[in-house]
Amino acid sequence: MSILQILHFPDDRLRKIASPVKKMDDQIRQIADDMLETMYQAEGIGLAATQVNIHQRIIVIDVSEDRHQPLILINPELLEKSGETGIEEGCLSIPGEKAFIPRAKEITIQALNREGRSFRLSADDLLAICIQHEMDHLIGKLFVDYLSPFKRQRIQKKMEKLQKINEKKDK
């Protein structure tokens, strides 16, 4: 398994729309495994393939307290949503930033699992929020897109400044 590099906002590659996975094979399973390892190492609860510059519809999530209940979603589709909720969301692609984002409280999705079998999942609370957040990544949408232009621009400038500092450290 490998740790993958997580792209950071405002990297344009985060805006690419992910393509459906056409065939479940060992390569896709390896990508999902590497994504899980990357997510755990970064102490995140979800990661979309877009965030690691792989533009396929793959999401990994683990919102369990013991961090031993990974969920792999291949080609997820939102079937139903209801209610309203929201929390202060963070994102591995926008480190150090959080914002309250409105989301559906309950959702039902359909996806393929690691073996390529189709399944339905009904989720609420944190799992529902996390799935919606990660599915946004698959269409090139970030949580900052829900914010006012002023707040989004402030975060973008902060991230660009951080990127320049990190580039100087790497030299």
Curated annotation (Swiss-Prot):
Q: Which reaction does it catalyse?
A: N-terminal N-formyl-L-methionyl-[peptide] + H2O = N-terminal L-methionyl-[peptide] + formate
Q: What name does this protein carry?
A: Peptide deformylase
Task: Name the Pfam families for this protein.
Answer: Pep_deformylase (PF01327)
Listed binding positions for Fe cation are C91, H133, H137
The cofactor note reads: Binds 1 Fe(2+) ion.
Taxonomic lineage? Bacteria, Pseudomonadati, Pseudomonadota, Gammaproteobacteria, Enterobacterales
Annotated EC: 3.5.1.88
The similarity annotation says: Belongs to the polypeptide deformylase family.
The protein's gene is named: def
List GO molecular-function terms, semicolon-separated: metal ion binding; peptide deformylase activity
Q: Which UniProt keywords apply?
A: Hydrolase, Iron, Metal-binding, Protein biosynthesis
Entry cofactors: Fe(2+)
| CDD domains documented for this protein | Pep_deformylase
Q: What is its biological role?
A: Removes the formyl group from the N-terminal Met of newly synthesized proteins. Requires at least a dipeptide for an efficient rate of reaction. N-terminal L-methionine is a prerequisite for activity but the enzyme has broad specificity at other positions.
Give the InterPro entries listed for this entry: Peptide_deformylase (IPR023635), Peptide_deformylase_sf (IPR036821)
Family matches, as PANTHER family: PEPTIDE DEFORMYLASE
Q: Which residues form the active site?
A: E134
